Regions:
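Short capping segments at the starts of secondary-structure elements
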Residues: 94-97, 165-171
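A short acidic, leucine-rich amphipathic alpha-helix
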Residues: 101, 172-174
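Charged low-complexity interaction tracts in eukaryotic proteins
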Residues: 77, 125-138, 194-235
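Charge-enriched amphipathic alpha-helical scaffolds
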Residues: 105-114, 182-208
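Basic helix-extension-helix modules of the SAP/HeH family
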Residues: 2-128
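Positively charged, polyanion-binding regions of nucleic-acid-associated proteins
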Residues: 24, 69-72, 149-167
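C-terminal helical accessory/scaffold domains
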Residues: 196, 213, 220-300, 304
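Conserved small/polar residues in nucleotide/adenosyl-binding loops
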Residues: 320-326
Length: 330
């Protein structure tokens, strides 16, 4: 499924099925969808001429496409860890009531028909339709979970490298992975994972022989050569595996003493809300990754209306001149 096809279905969430118990058929779940929603999903699954189908044959066509083994395998392999975890827990438990922290998870799976919401006794839970569960268990019996774990690890390395370095030669990413893991990765295996996630606009992209953060796409990657020139021959900072993988989260930055001082300044002196302060720090960190000049970092602070007068200016300027560990890379 391409990014465009996925987006065609991304506006739909699927209706809630009023149902007691965990056993719900795929047809029963899809019957709650409107014809417009079903046609959108049918288009995403490349069903021929969905606009000409009425609801019942449309449901049959969508269900048939949704249950294709190869398609289900690719969809599940492309899931981000949070969505995959939700699917796996729900499939194992039969029904699963999401925690408050999981409120944003599961939407992609609902939109694609692999997960549905049920209401039983006034409370909503998730369940996996019976036919979907049956096909998934066939995949699991063939070792799918091991393959998924491996693919997610490779994806996490790609996310971490693109967030930490901004741009990295693909060969260097392979060397870092192979240095930190017992089972080595090949170029072919790397590309199969990268292309699957890039098609869904995951956060990184391929440019020439480099893996780059997809933020460069905004100006058609014209800043990539400039960044490569500025980092020159600097030795790359490579954190230990567990620290490196923290950078798979695009909002993560290393809590250096300097970063802690800046966070304290934003919270106490600039009086920013905690979430906003973290957002400012994340943006500053990424700008540092891209070798931004101190004046550009100060511009970020001005954009957030952070006071830059007197002692405040001195603190901000001191921070923007600091060389963080992540500022040394090739």
């Amino acid at each position: 499924m391409t990014s465009k096809q996925y987006e065609a279905s991304s506006g739909q969430r699927g209706a809630v099925v009023v149902h007691a118990g965990e056993n719900i058929s795929l047809k029963e779940a899809l019957e709650q969808w409107t014809v417009t929603e079903l046609r959108s999903l049918a288009s995403a699954y490349s069903v021929k001429a969905p606009s000409k189908l009425r609801k019942e044959p449309l449901i049959d066509a969508v269900a048939s496409a949704l249950l294709e083994r190869d398609r289900m395998r690719e969809v599940l392999l492309a899931l981000e860890p949070e969505d995959w975890g939700l699917f796996h827990r729900t499939e194992e438990a039969g029904t699963y009531r999401p925690k408050q922290s999981e409120g944003g998870c599961g939407l992609a799976l609902q939109r694609l028909g692999y997960l549905c919401r049920i209401r039983d006794g006034g409370k909503e839970s998730y369940t996996v339709p019976e036919e979907v569960r049956a096909v998934y268990r066939e995949l699991a019996a063939e070792g799918f979970c091991t393959r998924k774990e491996r693919a997610d690890l490779i994806h996490a390395y790609a996310m971490a490298a693109s967030n930490l370095y901004g741009v990295i030669p693909q060969g260097d990413l392979i060397r870092i992975f192979n240095t930190q893991n017992g089972k080595k990765i090949t170029e072919e295996e790397l590309f199969s994972v990268l292309l699957r996630h890039i098609s869904l606009k995951c956060g990184y992209a391929l440019w020439d022989k480099y893996l780059v953060n997809d933020a460069f796409e905004a100006n058609d990657y014209r800043d990539v050569p400039d960044l490569l020139k500025r980092v020159g021959g600097k030795p790359r900072y490579i954190p230990p595996k567990q620290e490196l993988l923290k950078y798979a989260d695009p909002d993560y930055y290393e809590r250096t003493p300097e970063a802690s001082l800046m966070r304290h300044y934003l919270l106490q002196d600039a009086d920013l809300e905690p979430d906003l302060a973290e957002g400012v720090l994340s943006e500053l960190h990424f700008a540092i990754v891209l070798e931004a000049k101190p004046v550009q970092l100060l511009d970020i602070l001005r954009d957030y209306e952070v006071p830059l007068l007197g002692d405040h200016m001195q603190i901000a300027v001191s921070y923007t001149h600091l060389t963080l560990p992540t500022n040394s890379r090739v």
